[in-house]
């Protein structure tokens, strides 16, 4: 809008819902159409965490992630409890992934989550 300051580009886009097998669940297909690279390891880890949390239907989920420009796009399930399990599982890798794809440098709050960063070579 005219007179509005320009917003910086997003480095992380998170969606919730639309990742199941029902006909209306099309979120994974939508991001596959706009992302340049898909990161299937995110979905694999989210399903693993959900299975370990005692959710046998986690195998029906189609969560995934992809790279869209310099942004990481992550699809999450629609249920709030499942969102928590899935975010807890993948978030340690998010700041480093965003750094690798040229997005903003994100700091982590060590009290909340241990963020992974590779050790620098000396």
PLM regions: where:
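Non-catalytic beta/alpha edge segments that cap or flank active sites
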Residues: 1-122
